[in-house]
Structure formats: structure tokens, C-alpha cells
A protein has these predicted regions:
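A conserved ligand/cofactor-binding region detector
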Residues: 1-239
Length: 239
């Protein structure tokens, strides 16, 4: 459905970035700048940077659909993408601009980068390889998508207490994930277990355990290019 509309693209000037970060903090996160903590400022910055990637992402998707190009689909149980703020800033070429904007607001970019949780989506070479493939596809301008699982927890947090290792759950989504877009209308039933019931020449899969798989999309930017791709992760929901 083509509906005519107009909008103003977010600009990359230091002043515009300052306004955008403050706006996200107040109207998206709902926090008073006077009492916001570092993680809330981090999320506001992530939302502001994401805004500046969305337009090229949608443009890439539109071009791929209109040209009916072939795409590479990379399926992996893990995507060890790591912290994404610094990568996004370098890909967009706005690292210094965001650094200056935050400095003028009394904040430190490096400190905010350190606040970002490492996504618990992988823990080894398999996940790192998958993430590198997605980065390379975007940097080379090759249409592609990654498909994986949106784990709620990473491996575990490790602390040393009285000389012994103590493990605790690593809930990496504790502060949310501003990079992702939840796709409420893209859900599928996934069934486990059960048994096969034979009815003449037909067979039915019955007495199964069902969950819903819901899609979450994340932008994968290419370095120094308008090309972007998508990482789609599936989250398990109660049916």
C-alpha cells in the first residue's frame, strides 16, 4: 500500500545529535536528564544512532525487493556480534561527532560504550564466524540475512567468592535492546514431542508441546557504505 507522506531525515551534526539523544532519553525512555544513570544515557544514544541507520536499512530492503535479487541466508545457532555501538558509529562515520555531542552534554562516549551489555547470542568460534559473515556481506553490498535464536540468557556470569567460582544467570536483556525491532505480526507455532496418530492413509501429529516463535530484526550496517542487511532472531513465547 503506497501512502504519500513526507518526513525529515535525522541529520548528523553535533547539535542535531545532542537534541536527538536528549529527546530519546525523555520521550522514549521517559527519564529526567537530571537523574538519568549511565545505562539510560547509553540507551538514549543507541536509539539516536539507530535512527540514523534505519533510513539506509529500509532503502536497502526496498531495493532488494524491487530488483528481485538473490539473497544469502545464513542460519546459525549462534551470532557472537559483540557490543554494537562503536561498530555502528564507525560504519556511519560519526564516531567523533557523537563523541563531541556527548562531551558537550557532560558525558563520556567510552564510558557509555563500556556500559553496553554483550549480547548473549554465542560463546565461541561458530558465533564469531557467523557475525563476521554478516558484517562482510553488508560491507561488500551483498544482500543477505542471518537467522538465529534470541536467547534470553547468555552462558553465565562468573564471580570468584572466597576463592571459588560462583555462577549466576547472565540476563543480557536486563536493560532492553534498543537495536532490535520486535515484529509482533511475524509469529509461528513450533511444536515439540507428541506422537504420530495414524488415520487410514493419513497421519496426524498430536499431543505436542507448542510455543510461539516471534521475530526480532536487527540492522547489520556495512562499513562506509549505504548497504545494510538484517539479522532476524526468533524468541520463544508462550502459546
Amino acid at each position: 500500500m503506497n501512502v504519500p507522506f513526507s518526513y525529515a531525515s535525522p541529520t548528523l551534526s553535533v547539535e542535531a545529535l545532542k537534541h536527538s539523544i536528549a529527546y530519546k532519553l525523555m520521550f522514549i525512555i521517559g527519564k529526567d536528564p537530571a537523574i538519568a544513570n549511565k545505562h539510560e544515557w547509553l540507551n538514549a544514544t543507541l536509539f539516536a544512532v539507530r535512527d540514523r541507520m534505519v533510513e539506509r536499512w529500509l532503502r536497502s530492503n526496498r531495493a532488494q525487493l524491487s530488483q528481485e535479487v538473490r539473497q544469502v541466508y545464513y542460519l546459525s545457532m549462534e551470532f557472537l556480534i559483540g557490543r554494537t555501538l562503536s561498530n555502528a558509529l564507525l560504519s556511519l562515520g560519526i564516531y567523533e561527532d557523537v563523541n563531541s555531542a556527548l562531551e558537550e552534554m557532560g558525558l563520556n562516549l567510552e564510558e557509555l560504550i563500556d556500559e553496553e551489555n554483550d549480547p548473549g547470542l554465542g560463546n565461541g568460534g561458530l558465533g564469531r564466524l557467523a557475525a563476521c559473515f554478516l558484517d562482510s556481506l553488508a560491507a561488500l553490498g551483498l544482500p543477505g540475512r542471518g537467522y538465529g535464536i534470541r536467547y534470553d540468557y547468555g552462558m553465565f556470569k562468573q564471580n570468584i567468592v572466597d576463592g571459588r567460582q560462583k555462577e549466576s544467570p547472565d540476563y543480557w536483556l536486563e536493560y532492553g535492546n534498543p537495536w532490535e525491532f520486535e515484529r509482533h505480526n511475524t509469529r509461528y507455532k513450533v511444536r515439540f514431542g507428541g506422537r504420530i496418530q495414524q488415520e487410514g492413509k493419513q497421519a496426524r501429529w498430536v499431543e505436542t508441546e507448542e510455543i510461539l516463535a516471534e521475530a526480532y530484526d536487527q540492522i547489520i550496517p556495512g562499513f562506509d557504505t549505504d548497504a545494510t542487511n538484517t539479522l532476524r532472531l526468533w524468541s520463544a513465547q508462550a502459546s
